[in-house]
Amino acid sequence: MTARPAKLRARDLGLPFDGKPGKFNAITDVSGVEIGFTTLIEGEGPVQVGKGPIRTGVTAILPRGKREKPSPIWAGHHNLNGNGEMTGTHWINEAGYFFSPICITNTHSVGMVHHAVVGWMIDQYRSLFQEDHAWAMPVVAETYDGMTNDICGRHVAEAHVLNALNAARPGPLQEGNVGGGTGMITYEFKGGTGTSSRMINITDKAYTIGVLVQSNFGTRKDFTVLGVPVGKHWPEDAVFTELTGHETGSIIVIIGTDLPLLPIQLRRVAKRAAIGIGRTGTPGGHSSGDIFLAFTTANDVELPGLMSEQPLGYSHHYINDNHFDVIYDAVVQAIEEAVLNAMVAAESMTTVKPAGYTLEAIDHDRLKAIMMQYNRLKEEP
């Protein structure tokens, strides 16, 4: 693996993205959201199941941070192509909410991560689980990192998940080879974890939309940056094209906002993630797991227990659908930028199955040169 001296982001290269980002240009610009990572990188050479090499991890998202009592997190879910997993979505589709952390990892570690999150919730919300009949249905999503990681060795342990959850904080985030995105691949370059945000105004009220992606999708020929067909200018070192000739990856998109939205509205927001990733070129592959979740931190109400007195109902504030165009624009813009942030921050990584290839991090100078050919780069001040 080749390290870079500094973690640049796509905007640092002069790419002229639309929209206004928040302070951190991250999902943590949404007040209350906390993110934690566990990153596992160990070993070199061809895969030996159970021994390594290990290049994987866990990303933990706490939509309302660490609280003594959970509350419903209103949400909507959408699959563009469902060759993947996101647990907890049956209930989200049914009831419109969840109350767990969200974790993202590799495909073969979903069970361990789910197990660990249940334990964390029982400890974190002790009174709820000890004094009432609460049940935990964590949201755990995945993408496949078996080309760079001994995925069948299942190296993510309970302690790694707990570390990511307990380490979750607000503020700026790491990107690229970090957390669940450690071993991921995007457009046959090294990919990983990326984030971005947008600030919008609706009837003079300010709102924030933030996204986090675990980016592991795309074939080189489709790779597009702000409308520029970059992949057509960059055919070399495209490992999947050489080995399989088709896309085999996935992407998880998590959208968080403080906009007051109903679950059915959040599902509509989640659907727009397809347009955001589509702007980077992908048509959505047959073998891809493109799974999206949108949640809001608004309309914070108490989670009723089975043994407590039930409220007659809740009073929710929500945005008029006629104001949604600006929301959709912001979501699409932030997702496009988050994917590119993952790629720009990533570091090159060798493969383990098959061994002997290198997944190159995208070369910043070459990307800038291609963008300049199309007059799609900001002039340096």
Show the residue positions of the predicted features.
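Alpha/propeptide regions of enzymes that mature by internal proteolysis
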Residues: 1-381
